[in-house]
Regions:
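Active-site segment of extracytoplasmic enzymes that catalyze sulfate/phosphate-ester chemistry
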Residues: 28, 36-123, 128, 158, ...
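Catalytic metal-binding/acid-base residues of hydrolase active sites
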Residues: 34-35, 83-84, 142-143, 219
Length: 245
């Protein structure tokens, strides 16, 4: 039997206390650009029964705020337990040149430098959990650097559906202009479903004796705004927004 703890936020600092003798499996769900009013328990317009159940059966942190309301800084802060500025992130990663340690955003009048990747020297919660025997799986969006700084270099044992892009080109094929992690996916397959199916497949096939950490970091609901076709037909009033949730 697989005992799971599902969390939407997990921050481990420099000190990690010992787990109980029976170590739980941990599933981390992280959704991109999702507002607090974009879920059914805060807004009845949205139909999210499974997420609503997670809330009702667990703990709801109503005053847990992201360190920075943009992609890369939030991810760096979540992984390391640090305020994003302490990791050198002022904004999301803009380019793809890993020869640069810092980069500037063209439209920033102050030309404030921000990191182009999460340094390997930073300690992630995946690396801490490995000290307790965890097998760590990463599924989905990374946006903390290109291949030399991918999840498998930051404490994760394997990854699925990960590339260097900060957002897809489309939620249907072709998902990305280059380095598409799903080149053989069927034409009518929705990207968010591929991420979810990959996570479920990992859980169903996991046969190791050690506990696991499963990071499920969705590309959605980041733009481009493209709703799932079948859901968009149901939600005629707002087919794109409701079709993505």
């Amino acid at each position: 039997m697989k005992n799971l703890i599902t969390v939407s936020a997990l921050l481990l600092g420099s000190q990690v206390t010992a787990f109980s003798q029976e170590q739980p499996n941990i599933v981390m769900l992280f959704v991109d650009d999702l507002g607090w009013a974009d879920l059914g328990y805060n807004n009845p317009v949205f139909d999210t029964p499974n997420i609503n159940k997670l809330k009702s059966d667990g703990l709801y942190f109503s005053r847990a705020y992201v360190a920075s309301a943009t992609s890369s800084p939030s991810r760096a802060s979540l992984l390391t337990g640090k305020e994003s500025l302490r990791c050198g992130f002022v904004r999301h990663i803009y380019g793809k040149d890993t020869s640069l340690e810092f980069e500037t955003f063209d439209k920033d009048p102050g030309k404030m430098k921000s990191r182009a990747y999460l340094p390997l020297e930073e300690i992630t919660y995946a690396e801490r959990l490995k000290e307790f025997g965890y097998y760590n799986m990463f599924v989905g969006k990374w946006h903390l650097g290109t291949e030399p700084y991918f999840p498998t270099k930051q404490g994760f044992d394997a990854m699925y559906g990960t590339c260097e892009h900060g957002h897809p080109n489309n939620y249907y094929q072709p998902f990305f202009k280059t380095n598409n992690p799903f080149p053989k996916a069927r034409k009518n397959t929705y990207l968010t479903n591929l991420i979810g199916d990959g996570a479920v497949d990992f859980i169903n096939k996991y046969d190791k004796k050690t506990p696991f950490l499963l990071n499920v970091w969705y590309y959605g609901v980041h733009g481009p705004q493209i709703g799932r076709k079948d859901l968009s037909l149901i939600h005629i009033s707002e087919p794109t927004r409701l079709g993505m949730i």
